[in-house]
Amino acid sequence: MEQNRVRIADIAEALGISTATVSNVIHGKTAKISDATVKRVEQELEKTGYIPNMAGILLARNNSRIIGVVMNDHVKYEGRVLEDGFVMSSLNALSREANEKGYFLMIKTTADIREIPVFASMWNMDGLILMGFCEADYEALRSQTRISFVVYDGYFAACSKVVNLTIGHYDGGYQAGQYARELGHTKALCLADNDLCMDKERMDGFRAAFAPGKALFWQIPALQKERSAYYAEHFRRFLNLHSTVVFAASDFYALDFMRFLQTKGVRIPDDVQIIGFDDTAASRESVPTLTTVHQDAAQRAKTALACLEAMRSGKECEAQIVLPVTLIPRESTRKMPCWTL
């Protein structure tokens, strides 16, 4: 059907519903219409071309069905934040959940949290999900926007209509440390690009469980070129440490260090064992596959949207929600009777 010939009656007939229902959806009067029906109508409107650009209708509504997702484009990502394994996994899960519930996702990357209120108000969003701004001033941000938002892994005092949706960072580190100790390790090396927020919790958990074993911490450079130089410069020192297991704050750093060691002839897991954190797709595809701490991106996405919906309808949500994590043993670790490093 051509765009200028499509009528509301055509849409209603195709879906087997009344013209009044279609009209109400178009004009945002959906209080008495099920989410499933709203979604069907919106999909049919787009498919037939009745509304070539839904933005005008969405922005005019009280409920735009737009969820903004803002990621901190930190310098460590070197301009490729959307390529990060954790970010990709999170966005994929949010996209699936948003589609299921009839929402539209709008994605923005920025290193400046001050851009967020403008972004949110410009598009009349139903809610926001923020990632990577661990110690930002969320109270100030909240005062600048009427929109409720969910923060992934924030570190801030509780404030109105903001949910801190985090995971068991300390517990994940603890599980990794306990597992390493059970394998018989007594010397470990911990890697992260900072000793703050979630990375600190992960390292603290590892150290607590690994005791009385010795766990040394290296704060590695965030940028790839500098990090590679750091590894090369400290390789001899690493060998002299006789650390038989490495725990990294993320799968990215675990795999990065594993590749470096492999270029130096170090065998994984025969000579050194490695544990990561996040359970990204790359951890399942590496050679050897990476032992890591799994976090459920789908569960977090489902919880995030449920919180936004609840806050929008005036209900109270917990100020902080902590989701569980689970250690996943794979090929980069195993119990060894002897070491040849």
Predicted regions and their residues:
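An alpha-beta-alpha
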Residues: Y174-L216, A319-T333
